[in-house]
A protein has these predicted regions:
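Activity-critical C-terminal alpha-helical subdomain
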Residues: 171, 421-457
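N-terminal flexible segment immediately upstream of the FAD-binding catalytic core
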Residues: 1-54, 70-101, 130, 253-262, ...
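FAD-binding subdomain of flavoenzyme oxidoreductases
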Residues: 92-96, 101-249, 449
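N-terminal accessory segments
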Residues: 1-30, 58-61, 294-312, 405-410, ...
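Short beta-alpha connecting loops at secondary-structure transitions
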Residues: 91, 98-101, 384-385, 419-425
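Conserved, mostly hydrophobic/aromatic
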Residues: 56, 197, 444
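C-terminal substrate-recognition/cap domain of FAD-linked oxidoreductases
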Residues: 18-21, 26, 207, 211, ...
Length: 457
């Protein structure tokens, strides 16, 4: 079959590419695997997506959906070739309605651009992954993306009120809408959010907005070590505070950040905590003072306080530099996003230190302390060496097994993709895995949507 020719006939040549350069650019994400598709399709509307899937369904052609392509787990790698369907051109903010408290967007809208647009009107879309300047709403929905502020405000799923989805056979389904409360039928929205492109393709989303908090304060505190910072997280929450963010960092990450950004950026100390509070001005000031005193009581050394938006954003920018700082070390960063019950934070870091000694692989820990989602990154030297890679995989196996034994999860926001496929049955359990497969077969009987990922052998 002449796949490019057939698709060109359906969509027109301006939406179809077989260029080597284009196919290579759409062969993977930020993970280590890649595979060229046979053809790349640039959908511009729901009708384009519907036509492509109807054709692919009839002809048993694999279709891998791609948003911004900046995931960390190989979720958009077209393992079986076929068609990569890019939603990058579907990048319109269709509507923003303060009256209804919603925004209607296409999947290619960049998350940070949506935030800017709604904040200009005095509203907010809280989910804020570190890659918000690059990532798309469609990708966020596919992985149920989180971010630092999900402690108080929740993850992407908490903001999806409605979806337009094209099913594997090309039929278009709508579920939900502009209603902030709706219990009609099954929670189909919850089924598609986090489904990693394996059950259908989202072509439009209706997202919940909230009034933009009028004031905020940030406290960035340095501690003697990571356990002291982790214990402070518990102290803050036990005292009745619910910050919008609680971000923790270990010594390895801090040292890498000092090298990239300057030694003066982070005062001496081997643990670091960022606390953000938002709300009404008087309440924020009062709570900020209480937390400042609590940080001191818990052993914090230097505490930086920011009250203006510009100062607060400067602290967030430092936090967003952590991943880049770790890459600057020259080591390969295996970007893991495990989750443990909040009470196990200190145990997790102690286990990571033990694992580092046993394997000789450096481990850098930072992330969302408030919800137990810590990026436990293996920093590997000479990762291209097969023996080294095998040692790193063995270390990951030890880490994931420990996390699951403690009641945790192997991924909190990046998704499973290819990277965590070897551990999915262990993570889900036999019965849950079988239910996942049953749902997949019901919605995609020919298995054309994002094949080769965690539900396939």
């Amino acid at each position: 079959m002449d796949l490019p020719g057939s698709l060109t006939e359906i969509l027109g040549e301006e939406k179809v590419s077989v260029s080597e350069e284009i196919r290579d650019a759409h062969s993977g994400d930020k993970w280590f695997a890649s595979h060229q598709p046979e053809v790349v399709v640039f959908a511009e509307c729901v009708e384009d997506v519907s036509k492509v899937l109807a054709f692919a369904h009839r002809n048993r052609v694999p279709v891998t959906t791609r948003g911004a392509g900046i995931g960390y787990v190989g979720g958009c790698v077209p393992v079986e070739g076929g068609i990569v369907l890019s939603t990058a051109r579907m990048n319109k903010i269709v509507a923003i309605s303060p009256q209804d408290g919603v925004a209607v967007v296409q999947p290619g809208v960049i998350t940070g651009e949506l935030q800017k647009a709604v904040r200009a009107l005095g509203w907010d879309y809280p989910p804020d992954p570190a890659s918000l300047k690059e990532c798309s709403i469609g990708g966020n929905i596919a992985t149920n993306a989180g971010g630092p502020r999900c402690l108080k405000y929740g993850v992407t799923r908490n903001y999806v009120l409605g979806l337009e989805v094209v099913l594997a056979n090309g039929r278009v389904m709508k579920c939900g809408g502009r209603l902030h409360k709706n219990k009609t039928g099954f929670d189909l929205i919850g089924l598609f959010v986090g489904s990693e492109g394996m059950l259908g393709i989202v072509t439009e989303a209706t997202l919940r907005l909230i009034p933009k908090p009028v004031s905020r304060v940030m406290l960035a505190a340095v501690f003697p070590d990571f356990p002291a910072a982790a214990k402070t997280v518990q102290a803050i929450l036990q005292a009745g505070h619910l910050p919008s963010a609680l971000e923790i960092t270990d010594s390895f990450t801090l040292e890498a950040a000092r090298k990239r950004l300057g030694a003066e950026t982070f005062p001496p100390g081997d643990g670091h905590l960022i606390v953000e509070i938002d709300g009404r001005p008087a309440a924020v000031r009062s709570e900020g003072e209480e937390i400042y005193n609590l940080l001191r009581e818990c052993g914090a050394g230097d505490i930086r306080v920011a009250m203006e938006d510009e100062e607060c954003e400067a602290i967030w920018q430092l936090r967003r530099e952590f991943s880049y700082s770790l890459r600057d070390t020259g080591l390969t960063k295996l970007n893991e996003d495990v989750v443990v019950p909040r009470g196990k934070l200190v145990e997790l870091v102690e286990f990571a230190r033990k694992l580092q000694k046993e394997t000789g692989i450096a481990i850098a820990c930072f992330g969302h302390a408030g919800d137990g989602n810590i990026h436990t990154n293996l920093m590997v030297e000479n990762y291209d060496d097969p023996e080294t890679r095998a040692r790193a995989d063995a270390a990951l196996d030890i880490l994931f097994t420990w996390v699951l034994e403690k009641g945790g999860a192997i991924t909190g926001e990046h998704g499973v993709g290819l990277a965590k496929k070897p551990w999915i049955k262990q993570a889900l359990g036999e019965t849950s895995f079988a239910v996942h497969r049953s749902l997949k077969r019901a919605l995609d009987p020919h298995g054309i949507l994002n094949p080769g990922k965690f539900l396939d052998d």
